[in-house]
């Protein structure tokens, strides 16, 4: 896989996540007797952020476990494979957050929602993507058993985050009740996790034999 293939894969996966969240928003609003465009956009952008974050976990795990060894087997250097994987992750995150930002411009209070939703969404995409990356690396380094165990762990983490987010939304509203310090800390934590997973990827690609 060349660099443009990694970029293309990241873009396609991001567009699939965007389309899936949009369709889910449509289905949810069709069940609502009072359909309003502004509330439909608000609901859709919230689905986009959290669905995109969850899919970053699943997709990066799959790409790390499958596409990375495949790229090396077809002659890509370890340097090309590593940076290709990083480009995939960056393109996916950028497109998800760019789509969310553009959709927020169509809401009644775009800046109020953006001030909360974008930092939390970015943190979720980076953090869950990092977890997915670690899962893929464990599969490469220790085999299918480690990949399955990591997958189960990721599922438990995702369910826990989903339950917490659901309870928070019921209690405080979709974007309400968050202290300002969380809006600063969350993206920093997500970026830290992202960098940590990059280091683990680097060590894995350069120091371990990749099993096909």
Predicted features, each with a name:
Residues 1-68, 80-212:
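Hydrophobic alpha-helical transmembrane segments of membrane proteins
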